[in-house]
A protein has these predicted regions:
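Catalytic machinery of carbohydrate-active enzymes
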Residues: 1-358
């Protein structure tokens, strides 16, 4: 078989290109360098990204994507009938090629049903036969940061190495959007703001303790005058409420009550962000917000946040990274991270000049 690098995608000839994006906020952020490489490879192409609705707002800030299509599953694209209808919609757009950043079998199946002539992605999940350009996934790539996971696939297909840096610029309407959200939730809109994302989608093994988040928040409020804003999904509302209860100072709890765009607008206003390993952590890093990320069960080598002012706190427990949803033992990876550890890192970041200040 001819090596795929010798028969890569003819990017420079493409005029209509589909990209199947990843499903989760953090993964989307980590695909941005790959999207930049695709854009650079196909300067003539109109690039459409197919994504789930809960990440769509993020692409308003991505200059490398022209159009966003929503994959509503659950919803109208659920089941075989829904996937057939989605494939029909894709067929009507006459895409010449599809790059699958998402690994699922169904991503390849839908693009095959859509009759897209060139279909490329990692040959995982039993889908190699459905792809015209399956990329072999070696073990070495799994040990590198996930930014490389996506970028190396595009490079193998013939794309350039455009670097791994990530920086999102807030939308022009973000200041007004953030002001509106903050005032709706009882804030004067005056900072400085400390953002805290105490939840984690994957499971409780990734979550630091509510009382320790609160302790750090209170001390930073006492010493730096920060006002804490809590972020998260509806599922994170209980842990956010627990943090607010534990604190001495009032907090603005936005968990479960904002759109992604509204959350991003407020995050972009934060002076400092404190988070578990989560999608919002990756967003804060991409905005260049000084950031402290608490890692326990997951591996900072592969999913650490971007950003020059991103600090990872981990104790490298002997059982970590276990990548489990719940801890089967004594949760030592998080127990060993103290409020003092996090406060010390936060105080150092808050003592540094803000970006753009002398």
């Amino acid at each position: 078989m001819t090596p795929i690098r010798d028969r890569g995608i003819p990017f420079h000839t493409l005029e209509r290109l589909l990209v199947r994006g990843t499903n989760w906020i953090g993964d989307v952020v980590m695909t941005l360098p790959a999207l930049r490489a695709i854009r650079r490879s196909a300067p003539r192409a109109r690039i459409t990204i197919l994504v789930k609705p809960w990440v769509a707002d993020l692409f308003d800030l991505c200059p490398d994507v022209d159009d966003v299509m929503i994959y509503e599953s659950p919803g109208i694209h659920e089941g075989l009938t829904g996937k057939w209808n989605l494939a029909r919609s894709l067929r009507e757009k006459d895409f010449q090629a599809a790059i699958l950043l998402q690994n699922a079998f169904e991503a390849a199946f839908i693009t095959l049903l859509a009759g897209i002539p060139l279909r490329a992605g990692y040959g995982t999940d039993g889908r190699s036969l459905l792809l015209t350009h399956p990329v072999k996934r070696g073990k070495a790539i799994l040990a590198r940061h996930q930014i490389h996971y996506y970028l190396e696939m595009v490079k193998t297909l013939g794309g350039p190495d455009t670097g791994t840096d990530i920086r999102l610029l807030p939308g022009k309407d973000y200041p007004a959007a953030a002001e509106k959200v903050l005032r709706t939730h009882g804030s004067s809109g005056e900072g400085p703001f400390l953002g805290i994302a105490p939840g984690a989608t994957y499971g409780p093994a990734k979550m630091w303790f509510a009382d320790r988040f609160a302790r750090v928040s209170d001390r930073l409020a006492d010493e730096f005058g920060v006002k804490t804003v809590l972020f998260g999904s509806p599922a994170d509302r209980p842990i956010a409420e627990a943090v607010a209860r534990e604190g001495r100072h009032p907090m603005i709890n936005l968990a479960g009550s904002t759109s992604l765009k509204e959350a991003m607008a407020v995050i972009s206003r934060c002076r400092l962000f404190l988070s578990n390993d989560s999608g919002l952590m990756h967003l804060a890093g991409a905005f260049g917000i000084p950031l402290i990320a608490v890692f326990g069960s997951t591996n900072p080598r592969t999913t650490s946040p971007v950003g020059e002012k991103s600090v990872v706190i981990t104790k490298n427990a002997s059982c970590s990274p276990c990548l489990k949803k719940t801890c089967p033992t004594d949760f030592r990876c998080m127990e060993e991270i103290t409020a003092e550890d996090v406060y010390g890192a936060a105080a150092r970041l808050l003592s540094e000049p803000k970006e753009g200040e002398a």
